[in-house]
């Protein structure tokens, strides 16, 4: 769930010129939910923590970014970049970089290049 949420939210952020709002349809006790409950007990799911980490992109300006030396996971039509990323800068100049490693087996070293150009508002 965390990989799907991270990858999807990074893609949405990188396409913020077209995606103005992204929501999760059902919040509790469903697939991809942010919380699970059982009677009076509740836990936050990995999806919750991805949404929590991504919150700094909200209201920020998308910055141009690229990954150098990235590899892929999957094969054929299921092949994806191993790492998805997006970068934003808020009104106070704080830059947020979020990365999603789509591999369940290995880490990936990345280099992120930022330009001074603002492309879209998130």
Regions found by a protein language model. Name each.
Residues 79-119:
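Carbohydrate-binding surface patches
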Residues 1-92:
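Aromatic/acidic polysaccharide-binding cleft in carbohydrate-active enzymes
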């Amino acid at each position: 769930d965390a990989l799907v949420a991270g990858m999807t939210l990074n893609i949405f952020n990188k396409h913020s010129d077209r995606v103005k709002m992204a929501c999760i349809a059902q919040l509790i006790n469903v697939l991809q939910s942010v919380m699970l409950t059982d009677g009076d007990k509740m836990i936050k799911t990995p999806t919750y923590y991805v949404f929590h980490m991504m919150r700094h992109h909200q209201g920020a300006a998308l910055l141009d970014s690229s990954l150098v030396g990235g590899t892929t996971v999957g094969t054929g039509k299921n092949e994806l970049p191993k790492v998805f990323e997006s970068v934003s800068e808020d009104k106070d100049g704080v830059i947020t970089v979020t990365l999603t490693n789509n591999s369940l087996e290995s880490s990936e070293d990345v280099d992120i290049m930022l330009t001074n150009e603002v492309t879209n508002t998130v």
